[in-house]
Amino acid sequence: MKIADLITWFESWANPAWCESWDNCGWQIEPGILHEEARVLVCLTPTLAVMEEAIALQANLIFAHHPLIFSPPKSLRRGEAIADMARLAFTKNIGIYSAHTNFDQVEDGTADVLAQILGLKDVAPIVPTQGGLGYGRVGLLDPFLNLQELLTVIQTRLAPPDLIFSPTADLQQIISRVAVLGGSGAGFISAVAETGAEAYLTSDCKFHQFQESRDRGLILIDAGHYATERPACDRLVEKLRSLNLHWVQLSNQDEDFRQFFVK
């Protein structure tokens, strides 16, 4: 499949026009590769390590969730990450394409995959946007679990390096309704509280957001940005393989940019 055809297929599923105004979805760098057979390296975040991996694997497209460029840089200087990525993209003929908030909303996108991993039933968006799409997912556990069992499921299936949850939570509380949103989801706490969810799995939560959740009677669970979004990259690879692409692989150089000290 040509890269142009691949992008057309993807954008019929997750149109970049659906992204937020502050976001930058779609082509980050297109060095003239649209008519080449697609050799795709999928990653969460486009970094120099991923670019070097793409060069070594002779990939011609880095398909990332996070954008390389959020706002137009005022200058490009050698030694700066974006500048070096751009230089390598053009000299090695490797495109960089990002699907961010558009991919968050769709079926088999970041939130939908999290809901599937937890086995949620009767799933709906936390914040609907259009035609059954929307941010986050909320649904029922089947069977219901107590909080300790739910935390164990999350730890086992997502393998986060650290799992933070509301300190006043009762580990024996039965949880029936769970909300999920991959990546930075603390801004949706008010919307989640209105869904009747008893627990909310997301990431990047601050001190006072845990306080807000406690005051609303919502158990907030922070599994980290990487652990809550990387599974959707795995799913994207599966979907791309179903298209019989010439070559597609999940990056082995993706990074969780946080490290935890263990005594």
Curated annotation (Swiss-Prot):
GO terms for molecular function: metal ion binding. Keywords: Metal-binding. A divalent metal cation 1 binds at H65, D104, E229. InterPro entries: DUF34/NIF3, DUF34/NIF3_sf. One of its GO terms (cellular component) is cytoplasm. The keyword Metal-binding applies. Signal peptide: none annotated. The keyword Metal-binding applies. A divalent metal cation 2 binds at H66, H225, E229. Gene3D superfamilies: NIF3 (NGG1p interacting factor 3)-like (3.40.1390.30). Homohexamer. PANTHER family: GTP CYCLOHYDROLASE 1 TYPE 2 HOMOLOG, NGG1 INTERACTING FACTOR 3. Belongs to the GTP cyclohydrolase I type 2/NIF3 family. This is GTP cyclohydrolase 1 type 2 homolog. It comes from Nostoc sp. (strain PCC 7120 / SAG 25.82 / UTEX 2576).
